Design a protein with these regions (language model features):
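Active-site-proximal beta-strand elements of phosphoester/diester hydrolases
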Residues: 17-25, 118-130, 163
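Active-site beta-strand/loop signature of hydrolases that rely on acidic residues for catalysis
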Residues: 22-23, 39-57, 121, 149-172, ...
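Structured beta-strand-rich core segments of catalytic domains in phosphoester-bond hydrolases
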Residues: 52-55, 60-129
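Metal-dependent phosphoesterases centered on the DNase I-like endonuclease/exonuclease/phosphatase
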Residues: 67-70, 142-242, 246
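Conserved beta strand-loop-helix elements of the APE1-like EEP
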Residues: 80-96, 225, 237-257
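Active-site beta-strand termini and strand-to-loop segments that position acidic
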Residues: 90, 114-117, 241, 252-253, ...
Length: 282
């Protein structure tokens, strides 16, 4: 009798794989607030960090590297101490990529991808446009340039987990003050249309011709959830839970049925963002 082993895209043995996404708003600052002590207790397989706000040599040493992990960085080369992304992993990737081909975007340290067999885990940091028209214009340029890349990945045959701070909410469920933010970056109709035009939270919403198909892990698991991942440092936004959900894990449709559960950790404040964890069946 021939026995077959069910296919699993995940590069580990065991019943599940845990991936955490976290915008640190400065990894050195987050470390002083206990982030790595918390992370060491989470049994995560992969951690995707955004806004490291440091150069790799400034993040060397045991204070920034929990036992059992390796780390890969993509620093901003045009402006030191700005942006920056990283991936921590228990397993050595087969390949790490740090550029998508547009120098202005790549040199700001906004993308890193770790490849494990047929699985790609990406840490993305999409620009914010909140500082003014110039950066909002750049954000729209990034969105236009990135869309065909995301559509290509969707149909590439690879399994993808896209972690990161996308600086865009998807709907009124994702922001406390929906009406008053309609003209603010991150909640602009054009931004929401772009992001929602890539997503298919239910299988029947997928449309290969238009490029819709990415699954928002949180929304797939919590269709009516109203949890947030970012709060302004102004006033008492965090205390009053006046937040935005702008940190995501988007996955290819092949991983929809692998979604096991997710959580947003708010008991401690390591940053103006909260760590977002997703568990996947392997």
């Amino acid at each position: 009798m021939l026995f077959t082993i069910p296919y699993s895209p995940f590069p580990i043995s065991g019943s599940s794989m845990r991936i955490i996404s976290f915008n640190a708003n400065g990894l050195r600052s987050a470390a002083t607030k206990g982030f790595f002590e918390w992370f060491a207790t989470q049994q995560a397989d992969v951690l995707c960090v955004q806004e490291t706000k440091a150069q790799e040599h400034q993040l060397a040493g045991p204070a920034f590297l929990p036992d059992g992990y390796r780390v890969w960085f993509r620093d901003a080369s045009t402006k030191k101490g700005y942006s920056g992304v990283a991936i921590y992993s228990k397993r050595e990737p087969d390949e790490v990529r740090t550029a998508l081909g547009w120098p202005e975007f790549d040199e700001e340290g906004r993308y890193i991808e770790a490849r494990f067999g047929n699985l790609s885990v990406v840490s993305f940091y999409i620009p914010s446009g909140s500082s003014g028209e110039l950066r909002q214009g750049y954000k729209f340029q990034v969105m236009d340039w990135l869309r065909p890349i995301l559509v290509e990945w969707l149909h590439s045959g690879r399994d993808y987990v896209l972690c990161g701070d996308w600086n865009i909410v998807r709907s009124a469920l994702d922001i406390k003050n929906w009406k008053s933010n309609q003209k603010n970056s991150g909640c602009l109709p054009a931004e929401r249309d772009w992001l929602n035009g890539l997503c298919a939270d239910r299988a029947e919403e997928a449309d290969a011709a238009s490029g819709r198909g990415w699954v928002d892990a949180y929304r797939a698991l919590h269709p009516d959830g109203q949890d947030y991942t970012w709060w302004s440092n102004r006033g008492a936004a965090r205390a009053n839970d006046v937040g935005w959900r702008i940190d995501y894990q988007f996955v290819t449709p092949t991983l929809r049925e692998r979604l096991q559960g997710c959580s947003i950790y708010t008991a401690q404040r390591f940053s103006d963002h909260a760590p977002f964890t997703v568990d996947y069946h392997t």
